[in-house]
Amino acid sequence: TGHAWRRDRMMTELASKSIGRPVSFDRTSTIEAATNLYWQSGVAATSFNQVSRALGVSKPTLYRYFGDEDGLVSAAIEHYVSQRTLYADLLGATGDIRTDLNAWFDKQIDDLYEKHADASMPTGCLLMECVQLGNAIGEKSRATVHQAVQGILDMFEERLKAAEAAGQL
């Protein structure tokens, strides 16, 4: 009976340990790297195989964490949008629509110059590229793009309505 007890205990310990190599996957850094790759090379021009090779992450791992290529593209778009500063606070800073819009556009242009001064930064706008791709990107990515663009439009609509109510338009 002593041997059976030890065998059962050993089997329980083995079963409680995960089998295989430990997972050393960093979802955030994978999304950041994929975002830069899609932004640099273009979403349509970048295959899932290229992403896998460039990131040094196996395709099965990418599928496990993102479901499919569309899931990874969608995550990259979300990350890109979250990193772009919209400076929404500038749109209502002074209460004068013209002053606020000028400040907002000035800040956007300053950021553009600053980002393009860094040669390692991709040029262009990943979000607008995805808008232009339309149905060439997956359904989940299209929904992410739509949500991001709608958020920007809503921000401006809210500010313009406030300006109209204040008699500035």
Residue ranges of predicted features:
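Helix-turn-helix
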Residues: 11-12, 29, 33, 37-79
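Short helix-capping/turn signature of helix-turn-helix
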Residues: 66, 129-137
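Hydrophobic alpha-helical connector segments
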Residues: 75, 89-123
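N-terminal intrinsically disordered/low-complexity leader segments
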Residues: 1-25
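Hydrophobic/aromatic residues within well-ordered alpha-helical segments
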Residues: 69, 76-80, 84, 101-108, ...
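Amphipathic alpha-helical packing segments from all-alpha helical-bundle domains
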Residues: 99-103, 122, 137-166
